[in-house]
Design a protein with these regions (language model features):
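Hydrophobic alpha-helical segments of integral membrane proteins
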Residues: 9, 50, 60-76, 86, ...
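Alpha-helical transmembrane segments of integral membrane proteins
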Residues: 2-4, 94-127, 173-326
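Membrane-water interface segments at transmembrane-helix boundaries in multipass membrane proteins
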Residues: 133-141, 145-200
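Alpha-helical membrane-inserting segments
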Residues: 18, 22, 26, 111, ...
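An internal, D/E-rich "acidic patch" concept
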Residues: 57-113
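Hydrophobic alpha-helical transmembrane segments of membrane transport/permease proteins
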Residues: 15-65, 158-180
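N-terminal signal-anchor/signal peptide hydrophobic helix marking the start
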Residues: 6-16
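Residue-level signal for discrete positions within transmembrane alpha-helices
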Residues: 12, 93, 97, 133-140, ...
């Protein structure tokens, strides 16, 4: 188990180094960073001084080592657009994105599992067919269109929910949350549904397929022959084994939720890291773009690492395979 953990950790470090190279290359391919920081009338001498202060005259390997060393300390440089440290901008926007992603994931997990279990246990019921239709809609419609439809229905026509923003938030140290205010909760409903709908349909379909497969296995037949109750068979045995692959998918999808929150945050003008990234792209703000790439990659790598470890703990077969000598 220890060797497996170390091997996964080394692979994670290798991935982050590769991503660091890509992020560093963005500065080279997007033109001279000095041109993004100064006006067109800036004298050449001042430009040269800025280049020297930024270390842009050093050899490229030296610049990369310095950039990666600073990135490890979460020092991503100064934003061209905001003239502020990128780390402070990300720190300011991160609570909004994480709060949205966590609520969307909880929504997707709870409703996805419930709908998937019901669809598997009552295949021919009208409600199960309705769930299947909803899953097709959730997978087929693009995220931005779902968001626009929700805004039109609940904000424009009914006027129940706000169409943009985060509402009133409460500061808890450096963290800000809208979960403690009514306006914050109302502002969170539509973005979380928009972001979590695709994940919900994916989890629902996975749970349904796994549940149907597990219910056909021999040990379920044996459990019925022993006289166990239907409730014990369905929820004590079948569902528990069904949730093993769901852990992997849900963990990986959480990273996707954070990465693809860009669209949802843009539609609802949600003040998170995704909206900050869109603004950076519009203004060619390379430090923010590179930092966002590194942060999202770090989240993906960390989630993958944790899911791999949890998977070996939950699944005894995989644990025995890892422990077996080569």
């Amino acid at each position: 188990m220890l060797a497996f953990t170390l091997r996964r950790a080394i692979q994670a470090i290798g991935v982050m180094i590769a991503v660091g190279i890509i992020a560093f290359s963005m500065f080279r391919f997007a033109g001279d960073p000095v041109n993004q920081m100064v006006s067109i009338d800036t004298p050449y001498a001042e430009r040269a001084a800025i280049r020297q202060s930024l270390g842009l005259n050093d050899p490229i390997p030296v610049q990369f080592v310095r950039y990666f060393a600073n990135a490890v300390q979460f020092n991503f440089g100064i934003s061209y657009q905001f003239r502020q440290p990128v780390a402070s901008l990300l720190k300011e926007r991160m609570p909004a994105t994480l709060e949205l992603a966590i609520v969307a994931t909880i929504f997707a997990m709870v409703f996805g599992i419930l709908m998937g279990v019901y669809s598997a246990l009552h295949e021919d019921s009208l409600l199960a067919k309705l769930f299947q239709a909803v899953s097709l809609i959730g997978i087929s419609l693009p995220t931005f269109l779902i968001g626009i439809l929700l805004i039109y229905l609940f904000a424009v026509i009914l006027g129940w929910l706000p169409s943009f923003g985060r509402g009133q938030v409460v500061k808890l140290g450096w963290w800000t949350t809208g979960l403690l205010t009514v306006s914050g909760l109302k502002a969170l409903i539509m973005p979380s549904i928009t972001l979590g709908l695709f994940q919900m349909t994916l989890i629902m379909r996975l749970v349904r397929a796994e549940m149907l497969e597990v219910l056909r296995t021999d040990y379920i037949r044996f459990a019925r022959a022993r006289g166990l109750t239907t409730r014990a068979i369905h929820f004590g045995h079948a569902l528990r084994n069904t949730l093993v692959p769901v852990i992997t998918v849900a963990g990986l999808q959480f990273g996707s939720v954070i990465a693809f929150a860009i669209i949802t945050e843009t539609v609802f003008q949600w003040p998170g890291m995704g909206l900050l990234f869109v603004q950076a792209v519009q203004n060619v703000d390379i430090p923010i773009m590179a930092a966002y790439l590194l942060m999202v990659s770090l989240i993906f790598v960390t989630i993958n690492f944790v899911v791999d470890i949890l998977y070996t703990i939950v699944d005894p077969r995989l644990r025995s395979t890892i422990s077996r000598p080569a």
